[in-house]
Amino acid sequence: MTRRRSRPSGGAGRRERARATGPQKPQAPEPPPPPSLEAGAGAGPPEAPAEPYRDDPREEDEPKLAPGPQVPPTTSQSVQTCCLLCHRERKGWEEGPSQNGLVLQGEKLPPDFMPKLVKNLLGEMPLWVCQSCRKSMEEDERQTGREHAVAISLSHTSCKSQSCGGDSHSSSSSSSSSSSSSSSCHGNSGDWDPSSFLSAHKLSGLWNSPHSSGAMPGGSLGSPPTIPGEVFPISEHHRHSDLTAPPNSPTGHHPQPAPLIPSHPGSFGSPPHPHLLPTTPAVHFPAQVSECPVAVAAAPHTPGPCQSPHLPSTSMPLLKMPPPFSGCSHPCSGHCSGHCSGPLLPPPSSQQLPSTHSRDPGCKGHKFTHSGLTCQLPQPCEADEGLGEEEDSSSERSSCTSSSTHQRDGKFCDCCYCEFFGHNAEKEKAQLAAEALKQANRSVSGSRELRPARESLLGWPDRELDRVNSFLNSRLQEIKNTVKDSICASFSMCELSVDSNGFSKEGATEPKPQSLAPSNPSGSSEQRPDINLDLSPLTLGSPQNHMLQAPGEPAPPWAEMRSPHPPWTEVKGPPPGIIPENGLVRRLNTVPNLSRMIWVKTPKPGNPSSEEPSIKGAPGCKQELPEPVASGGKPRKGKRQGNQAKKSEVSPASQSPACLETPSAKGQTPSPKQPSKAPEPPRVDSCAEAGEGSQGTRPGPGWADSPKADKEKGNSWRNWPGEAKARPLEQESVQPPGPARPQSFQQGKGRSRRSRNKQEKSASSLDDVFLPKDMDGVEMDETDREVEYFKRFCLDSAKQTRQKVAVNWTNFSLKKTTPSTAQ
């Protein structure tokens, strides 16, 4: 029958054969326990009901048995007290099982030893199935191999819900009961779904697999069919010689599961189990039950109720060891392969539990609770087990329980084995594979998605670089413009006169337009171009070069400037040009690049007046005008005039180039200068007067000075139109007229300025104009602040070139300026 059944049921048949081979052996030794078990559990009647339940209403059977007998027995007994399937009390069983299971099977080993071995090796105590349940399972399996799987699922569910869920689970101490109970427990929990259980065939396979797994193949026994046959032989053999087989703790343990297996397989793989049941099942089952009860009592189901004593000692080891033995966690073992002996027990419930167990916290807990029986332990059992097993089992079970909880949620226990082979391995595997594929796809797609972004990021730097370059270029242009403006401003008299001489920018500005209009409208326009050209002069050469370059240096504005410059250079000779230009030249020389610019600028406004040596008033006015022009034309540059004034400071350094220029200028200058001096003194005076009138008193005093002073005045004139401010400062600092004067800013210029500005505001104005003010903690206009920064810059720059400052500005001919102005 068994084989026939097993053939139809496939894995079940093999299992049965295996059981027949292996289990029958144990049946001989174990037969007594089954009767005792049956007697205890209501061997006759309970079995009958169990069988019916097994056959069709196993669910009902289990529930019926579970509610009444199983619950109390479970609670009362430390071992599985109820049949896994029918949940009948295992009182009789226990007596037999404890003695038979432990003694018969464990005769070789101490009763405790077997449970420990089982616990450690099998990792789960065997679940007990009453003979009635076994028979019913056999019948069920025979009648409905698949149906029984469902029935088992249901019966387990019912068991779980009925007895296992209640006391049965608590009483799941009895291995069978526990197995059933865990199943039913889960059912009771409502976590266990008949659907969640593997088909009877599959379950029996799993059960067998757990049995064989009990032999340790269970862990890896992925195929229930192979394992079942193997398991039963091993399992049953171990069952009847379970304690003898404890070495094969899985086997020894399996014997306990074997009963469970038979019961569940009876349910699932009725053929194998029935086969075992008739021959070995009854004996095996009882024997195992007896043996298992001890083991179970020790480790599995009493965890909460009866087994609390056993469980703590045995159950703990079982649970703890079993999980490892199972391969991972007890739940895993039970569920995973049912492979572990522990799993065998759970497999019936576990295989129903496979998913349930893995999903059902109860199942996990049960597994842990009774190791092998853990699955059978219902969640209640879990709780009980937690109590019975306490720290050991509970801790393990807690992990298992958490796993079980996850299992309930459709997740499976975390054990390695369960992950791959455990509860509903195929489904799980498929799910896991699908998830893995999804994740892989996500990662791949994510990486693909990220790649464009990364590429875009890579591309971004180019755009950013362009942006940065454009920004820097614009900033550079701004800086250039700023420098130009600063230079122009430095030379524009407006701010210089206002800052250094105290002249109102307006006054200076007014003269500037006036002089520009009268003397050189083009000059004023040139002045602005000069400002624009500031960079060009800066980039050009030294003032000398500037002089030479003036004609040769072509720059949009510089071309104009240079055209003026050549005239300017030519005009150097003219005294008027010399005087204003000397100042310009000095300053320009002081700051070679700046001086070029300044030359152009100042000459533009001032040169016209300089160009007219005969016209003193005109030069004066023009001189005045230059500063107004610069200031009016470039008030902001006026700010920078202070900066330029600084540059004037810097200009001393340039002055050496200026000196070079100066010599040539000097060559021209002496005669022109003197001639200009002759006219210039008056002119300077007049200019000074005019300048004073328009710009302030500053020009007057200085301008009234000697011809040299006039020359310097001319220079200063340039300065006071171009650097009114700087000039006074220089004058103050460098009152003694001398290009070598310490203030390299405008030593040459400084002389004339000193004379004039000294009288006016020389000391204070010069310092104010050329020396950067302390800007820390001082509130000042942004423009002023820029001017101060520029002054500081010029001062620092001037230091570098001061050595060049030794220029005889007196010899410098301002005619250059005049031509520039004429320009």
Swiss-Prot record:
Where in this chain does the entry annotate a coiled-coil region?
422-484
Q: List residues, modification Phosphoserine.
A: S694, S706, S813
Q: Does the record carry DNA-binding as a key word? A: no
Spans annotated as Disordered: 1-78, 158-191, 209-281, 381-409, 503-583, 599-775
Q: Which InterPro entries match?
A: FAM193, FAM193_C
Q: Where in the cell is it found?
A: Cytoplasm; Nucleus
User: Where is this protein primarily located?
Assistant: cytoplasm
> What are the Basic and acidic residues biased-composition ranges?
52-64
Would the keyword 4Fe-4S be found if you checked this record's keyword annotation? Answer: no
Biased region (Polar residues) positions are 516-526, 641-657
What residue ranges are annotated as transmembrane? Answer: none
Where composition is biased (Pro residues), the residues are 26-36
Superkingdom is Eukaryota
Sequence ranges of Acidic residues compositional bias: 382-393
Keywords from the named record = Coiled coil, Cytoplasm, Nucleus, Phosphoprotein
State where composition is biased (Low complexity): 168-184, 263-281
The entry's family comment says: Belongs to the FAM193 family.
The protein's name is Protein FAM193B
Organism of origin:
Bos taurus (Bovine)
